[in-house]
Regions:
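General structural feature for long, well-ordered alpha-helical segments within catalytic domains
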Residues: 50-53, 84, 88-92, 145, ...
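Short secondary-structure subsegments characteristic of cysteine-rich extracellular domains
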Residues: 68-95
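Short, glycine/acidic-rich hinge or "gate" loops at secondary-structure transitions
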Residues: 9-26, 67-76, 102-115
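Flexible helix-coil linker/hinge segments at domain or subdomain boundaries
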Residues: 1-8, 91-105
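Catalytic alpha/beta core of large soluble enzyme barrels
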Residues: 111-166
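Structured mid-domain segments that build the active-site/substrate or prosthetic-cofactor binding neighborhood
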Residues: 1-61, 65
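Short beta-alpha connecting loops at secondary-structure transitions
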Residues: 38, 72-80, 157-162
Length: 166
């Protein structure tokens, strides 16, 4: 029960170190041309807290709890697995919203939750809240799996929906 809060806090500590480095050591908002031109401002700055690997997390937990029905009950293909994914993201969102982040007045002093898009080099882990590539259910089921997460991500959710293969 304390694993998720622990790892959210460790990730937040890493994010805070990066924010402090950007502002205090690199003095980005004092020296970068975007700031000099007035295009960015420290008062509007916000950090993003990214989620990555939700599908694998859900699938591992379903198997660990003996509820995966031989691999059939997995994220994107099973109501219980999908509900578990939503519960995980809701809890992460609560923890991120509770955690102050310095210099992030653009986000009300907190990080924005972000569902990362991933890159082609990602191996054995799926980006953000996405369903693993190649394991996507039919389009409407795919959308129904991913849509319940969207309201929790002020900085966005990246996904790919295959409407037409051409």
């Amino acid at each position: 029960a304390d694993m998720l809060p622990r790892y959210v806090e460790l990730t937040a500590e890493l994010g805070e170190a990066r924010v402090r480095s950007l502002v205090e050591q690199q003095r980005f908002f004092d020296t970068h041309w975007l700031a000099a031109e007035g295009l960015i401002d420290i008062d509007r700055f916000a950090a993003m807290f990214g989620i990555f690997g939700l599908a694998e997390c859900v699938n591992l937990l379903m198997a660990y709890e003996g509820r995966d029905r031989g691999g059939e009950a997995r994220y994107g293909h099973d109501a219980d697995a999908n509900a578990l994914g939503v519960r995980i993201v809701e809890r992460v969102a609560e923890l991120v919203a509770e955690r102050p982040m310095p210099y992030c007045e653009g986000g009300g002093g907190r990080s924005y939750l972000h569902s990362q898009s991933g890159i082609d080099l990602d191996d054995a882990v799926t980006a953000g809240t996405r369903i693993p590539v190649g394991d996507e259910p039919p389009l409407l089921d795919h959308i129904a799996t991913c849509a319940p997460h969207h309201h929790l991500f002020a900085s966005g959710v990246s996904d790919i929906f295959h409407v037409d293969e051409t």
